[in-house]
A protein has these predicted regions:
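Nucleotide phosphate-binding/pyrophosphate-handling subdomain across enzymes
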Residues: 2-12, 20, 24-31, 180, ...
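Beta-strand->loop->alpha-helix junctions that form or flank phosphate-binding loops
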Residues: 38-39, 57-60, 95-99, 140, ...
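C-terminal helical cap/extension that packs against the catalytic core
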Residues: 380-441
Length: 465
């Protein structure tokens, strides 16, 4: 269903403080719509919205939508939300974020980045390459790009680079020109019910690829490999370390300052090509795969090899993705968004590879009880490359669910399976106390999680000093 474009519409975003909702709101404001929204509490995203002259109500109340003509809801909004109930009574058009996003970007040529992990970094890397190519794209990302100071920007070209959200299936509403699927992992099973259903949704997504576009899939990923024969639309190319990849990663170098690799390009009916010594200022094989995907789509679009190299080498990063915060007593403090066992394992493996001589201290805040319940065993095994683990209480993210296991026994299983020294803390101040009393010498301290842990890590600097 198409919406009527025009300045007379007042579009109200319920849950506007989320990273995806705030980004879409900023884009639509730039397109000329009157935008407002509401959320439960103030945040940096709301501060960015206000800087873009978007009105934000704190708290969800019926009166907030008195002048609204359209409602956009985030996937976190419950059926008993007073604004949603009032909108239904008023018979207002109500759209999920993914539906509205699909309507807006249908006016553009889209590069859609999907997958369980690595979407935000991949979207940001493509944006960096475009910027160095003097193409000004619209960008809608799941994280704040350091180069923009925002998660979204309205560009002057007809290109849109966007991160999809598969959590509620609405990523299937987004029109695709080019797409990337980075990997598929056991996430959002509260919605999909099974990994097979999740895989099936990605098959549907890839089958949407038009004849004038192309999809790119990471053939290194076991779940993607398992569905490759089920994709009816064969208009896709592969990337990865696998020898069969159309865009094959070779000669990998990883150190604490940068990553480097070559890209061997083997396309049907075309002469073999190479892009040598691709460098990026972030570490880890997972990020090299993200960079390969970014290079692949830009190469096929027609961006020059030199511009691809420049865009990757000068990448300015994304907030909450392996951010070096500060140093204290020769200890480096890092903030990272990793909150799934696969992500945690990738980040810690990368750290261990480039900092072999240092001890690694991980401060982990589990995000969502539902995720911890469904992936309990995987969480006990993902800290093997950490020497110490500070385990925080679960950040519930609004969930009213109970753990189906004993937390102290869970900690004991982590010690057993990950061979790590572990301490449980009950609140933020306990982290400060433990670090002051126990963390000395040449160490790396990394905070991990998608909740309040990022703010906790940032507040440590002035509290320690």
């Amino acid at each position: 269903m198409k919406i009527k474009l025009g300045n007379k519409e007042t579009i109200h975003f319920v849950g506007i403080g989320g990273i995806g909702m705030s980004g879409l709101a900023i884009i639509m404001k730039g397109l000329g719509f009157k935008i407002q929204g509401s959320d439960l509490s103030f945040s940096k995203n709301i501060e960015r919205l206000k800087n873009n002259r978007i009105k934000v109500f704190l708290g969800h109340k019926e009166k907030n939508i008195l002048n609204s003509t359209i409602l956009v809801i985030s996937s976190a909004i419950k059926k008993n939300n007073p604004e949603l109930i009032k909108a239904k009574k008023k018979k207002l058009p109500i759209y999920k974020r993914g539906e509205m996003l699909g309507h807006i970007v249908s006016l553009m040529k889209n590069i859609v980045v999907a997958g369980s992990h690595g979407k935000t970094t991949t979207t940001s890397l493509i944006s960096s390459i475009f910027s160095f190519s003097k193409i000004d794209p619209t960008v809608i990302n799941g994280g704040v790009l350091n180069s923009y100071g925002n998660s979204a920007k309205l560009g002057k070209s007809n290109w849109c680079i966007l991160e999809s959200d598969e959590s509620d299936g609405s990523f299937l509403d987004i029109p695709v020109t080019y797409s990337i699927v980075t990997n598929i992992d056991a996430e959002h099973l509260d919605y999909y019910k099974s990994l097979d259903n999740l895989k099936g949704s990605f098959v549907k997504f890839l089958d949407k690829t038009p004849s004038f576009g192309k999809s790119f899939i990471c053939i290194d990923d076991p779940a993607i490999k398992s569905i490759s024969n089920k994709i009816k639309n064969k208009n896709f190319l592969t990337y990865g370390l696998d020898r069969s990849a159309n865009f094959r990663i070779e000669n990998v170098i990883n150190n604490k300052d940068y990553s480097q690799f070559n890209l061997s390009i083997n396309l049907p009916g075309q002469k073999k090509d190479y892009i040598k010594k691709l460098q990026l200022p972030i570490i880890g094989l997972h990020n090299i795969r993200n960079a390969a995907a970014s290079a692949a789509v830009c190469y096929l679009i027609g961006i020059s090899n030199s511009m691809i190299k420049s865009g990757l080498k000068n990448f300015q990063g994304v907030q909450r993705r392996f951010n070096n915060l500060f140093s204290y007593r020769n200890i480096s403090f890092i903030d990272d968004y990793a909150h799934h066992p696969s992500e945690i394992s990738c980040v810690l493996t990368s750290l261990r590879e480039v900092y072999r001589e240092k001890e690694i201290v991980c401060i982990f805040q589990p995000h969502r009880v539902s995720r911890l319940n469904s992936l309990k065993d995987e969480f006990t095994k993902c800290f093997k490359h950490s020497d110490y683990l500070i385990l925080c209480p679960v950040f519930k993210a609004g969930e009213n669910i109970k753990l189906n296991f004993n937390y102290k026994n869970f900690a004991k299983q982590i010690i057993k399976n990950s061979k790590v020294n572990l301490v449980i803390v009950n609140e933020e101040k306990d982290i400060l106390k433990y670090v002051k009393q126990n963390i000395f010498g040449d160490k790396i301290v990394i905070g991990m999680g998608a909740g309040s842990i990022s703010n906790w890590m940032r507040s440590l600097e002035h509290k320690l000093k």
